[in-house]
């Protein structure tokens, strides 16, 4: 059975991905520092699954990363460890720089050290966002779309994408990038738009309006995203980016 590390596996997308991979008969190692948006309850009921392992750790901790790689020798890593809320990034961009840029840098350096010492490849799927493309006024963005981030959040994710590509080219790190649209589904943190709208409607509260109310957004169910991430891990070409949408 192949072993897959999921970083940020106790969050919204991460917890759904962990469950999806377990159903597909993979051994899953969940690395999560359990920040405010992570919730161990998301994975209630699978802690006794012999194919599931949880490690509380921060991907900025290189020593711990290498210890985990050495112990489990995974086939791949799907990196979901990130700060993701746009409004929070405007209020406090520092946390986003620490997690989304430095976290990816330290994860890459950990991988580079492990691969150099052990001569064993571990494929990395870095989960990014379509927010890196900024406002798309016509049609759809594709993988060759020019980056134009418009918030501290999207700027940090764009920076991480460029780091990934540079490490693939410079150090031959086996990595790919996915850029996905907005997700919805079970276990989503209530600050996100769809659960927030539902909560406000139920409680007769006003609905948030962004811009003039004429903007359009694309959503994908989180389980479809999980399916795409596994296919990118198994079939994605190293150094490439893959847009994921509905």
Model-inferred region functions:
Residues 1-183, 223, 233:
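N-terminal Rossmann-like NAD(P)+-binding domain of SDR-like oxidoreductases, especially those catalyzing
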Residues 36, 186, 246:
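Short, conserved catalytic or interaction motifs in soluble domains
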Residues 55, 178, 209-210, 244:
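Hydrophobic residues at beta-strand termini and immediately following loops
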Residues 94, 198-202, 217:
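Short alpha-helical segment that forms part of, or immediately flanks, the ligand-binding pocket
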Residues 158, 183-196, 203-205, 209-210, ...:
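Glycine/proline-rich active-site loop of Rossmann-fold NAD(P)-dependent oxidoreductases
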Residues 170, 216-219:
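A short, basic/aromatic alpha-helical/loop segment that forms part
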């Amino acid at each position: 059975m192949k072993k897959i590390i999921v970083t940020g596996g106790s969050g919204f997308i991460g917890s759904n991905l962990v469950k999806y991979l377990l159903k597909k008969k993979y051994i899953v190692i969940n690395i999560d520092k359990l920040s405010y948006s992570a919730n161990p309850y998301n994975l209630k009921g699978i802690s006794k699954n012999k194919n599931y392992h949880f490690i509380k750790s921060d991907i900025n901790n290189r020593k711990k990363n290498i210890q985990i790689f050495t112990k489990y020798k995974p086939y791949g890593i799907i990196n979901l460890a990130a700060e993701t809320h746009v409004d929070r990034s405007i209020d406090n961009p520092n946390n986003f720089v620490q997690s989304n840029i430095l976290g990816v840098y330290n994860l890459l350096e950990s991988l580079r050290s492990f691969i150099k010492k052990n001569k064993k490849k571990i494929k990395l799927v870095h989960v990014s966002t379509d927010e890196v493309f900024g406002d798309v006024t016509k049609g759809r963005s594709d993988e060759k779309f020019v980056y134009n981030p418009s918030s501290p959040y999207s700027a940090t994710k764009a920076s991480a994408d460029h780091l990934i590509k540079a490490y693939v080219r410079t150090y031959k790190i086996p990595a790919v990038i996915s850029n996905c649209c907005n997700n919805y589904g079970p276990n989503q943190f209530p600050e996100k738009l769809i659960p927030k709208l539902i909560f406000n409607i139920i409680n007769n509260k006003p609905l948030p309006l962004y811009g003039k109310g004429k903007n359009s957004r694309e959503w994908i169910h989180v389980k479809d995203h999980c399916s795409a991430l596994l296919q990118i891990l198994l079939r994605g070409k190293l150094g490439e980016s893959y847009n994921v949408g509905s």
